[in-house]
Amino acid sequence: MAINPITRNKIKDYLNSFIQQQLSVYRERSLREFQDVDSYLPSLSKDGDLKPFHASLIPASIMRLNRFERSLSTGLGSTFEECTRLIALDHHAVALRNYDIQAALDQAQWAAIDQLISIIDRGLKHQTPSLNQMLEQIQSIPLTGILETHIVRADLYIQRHDGSELFFEIKSPKPNKGQCLEVMQRLLRIYTIKQQSAVPVKAFYAMAYNPWGISRASYRSSNTKKYTDFSNAVVIGQEFWSLIGEPSTYTELLEIYHEVGLAKSAEITQKLLQ
């Protein structure tokens, strides 16, 4: 078993608390019901969430459920980060969220990273260079002798028992262009900071699941493929969770999410459909 019973319970408690918090927020938010045109149109909303056409067609309880689902989906990314941390602690020496690396590098190296990202952004290369190609460019530039200190934050940091290090940026599997460029910049900075490390270092853009299917070959995001080193920098679904734990980690974690969902489904329906 990749996720031991104690960790399973910690994950369940965390997910229960997450859903409860989401429910509390949405139970407290009033939703203007559509009784008739004359009473609805003069309504005011400080949140800018009046939708006269939606409200006239869809019952308020269903609208509330829809809002809850969208909010839950937005916040779900934070649950992936915490679950990876909890699982990783069972398999590795260290696992930390929001891990900061502070380093002083030559001014020319920071500038070279930004220039490479700008080249990718403007599409000046037919294909995004590999991480290794970009790192070779960064390491070969003439240095100025002027040091600049920057802080780079990783969503998740893991130190394995052999001392090797893993850095993960855990982001949406359907990123926009800006998100891809931001992650690539961060990965290049991490690798450049760690270039003299005595232990092996790997940094990845991690996606908790693949929206197009189970296999890597089925993945279809054009932004990811165009603006990242997809072959070497990106890990998706099971390949990501296997790095965190074992080959069965992904399916075991999904089972935990499902168990929590089944246990909370009646409460969610009752509270949001009232």
Curated annotation (Swiss-Prot):
Using the UniProt record, name the top-level EC class of this enzyme in a single word: hydrolase
Question: Recorded E.C. number(s)?
Answer: 3.1.21.4
Reactions it catalyzes: Endonucleolytic cleavage of DNA to give specific double-stranded fragments with terminal 5'-phosphates
Q: What is the effect of changing residue 223 to I?
A: Greatly increased specific activity
The alphabetized UniProt keywords are:
Endonuclease, Hydrolase, Nuclease, Restriction system
Record's InterPro entries?
Restrct_endonuc_II_TdeIII
Domain of life here?
Bacteria
Give any Pfam family that matches: RE_TdeIII
* A molecular function (GO) term: DNA binding
Q: Which GO terms describe its biological process?
A: DNA restriction-modification system
Q: Which family does it belong to?
A: Belongs to the TdeIII type II restriction endonuclease family.
Q: What does this protein do?
A: This system is more active than isoschizomeric RM.HgiBI.
The molecule here is called Type II restriction enzyme HgiEI
The organism is Herpetosiphon aurantiacus (Herpetosiphon giganteus)
